[in-house]
A protein has these predicted regions:
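Function-determining sites in protein domains
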Residues: 20-136
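Sec-dependent bacterial lipoprotein signal peptides
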Residues: 1-18
Length: 136
């Protein structure tokens, strides 16, 4: 009986620890403020020959993008191989006033730094990300 209780406690503890990382990422995205941003650079590829591009957001675009980013809800972390797909890819490098940078790549799976997550409210927000993906 003691072994069962110990196993239950270990499983609960591991579940809590695994869930904390996801909550931290959501909290980080929700708490970014436009006033903390020096610049947002949008880079990517259209998937075609000579399809690379780079663009820096205007002040108004930074505000709009951060407002959108604050609404993102991420789910479980997924394997990089599952998340990667061919075709067009957009990256947003957020340059913070603290001289730190955060690179994200929204898609069906949402990349934050070097990790990929389920994009839980993809259907709700994707059309708004398409607007930013179209700015070049």
């Amino acid at each position: 009986k003691k072994i069962g209780i110990v196993l239950l406690i270990l499983i609960s503890l591991i579940g809590t620890l695994l869930g904390c990382g996801k909550q931290d990422v959501n909290k980080d995205l929700e708490s970014i403020e436009a006033s903390e941003i020096k610049q947002i650079e949008h880079t990517g590829t259209t998937g075609g020959k000579d399809g690379n591009y780079s663009y820096s957001f205007s002040d108004d675009e930074v505000i709009e993008f951060i407002n959108l980013l604050n609404q993102v809800k991420l789910g479980d972390e997924v394997d990089e191989n599952k998340a990667l797909s061919s075709g067009a890819v957009s990256y947003y490098t957020i340059h913070l006033a603290t001289d730190e940078t955060l690179t994200i790549s929204p898609g069906k799976y949402f990349k934050v730094a070097d990790r990929y997550y389920e994009f839980d409210n993809y259907d709700e927000l994707w059309d708004e990300f398409i607007v930013f993906n179209s700015i070049k």
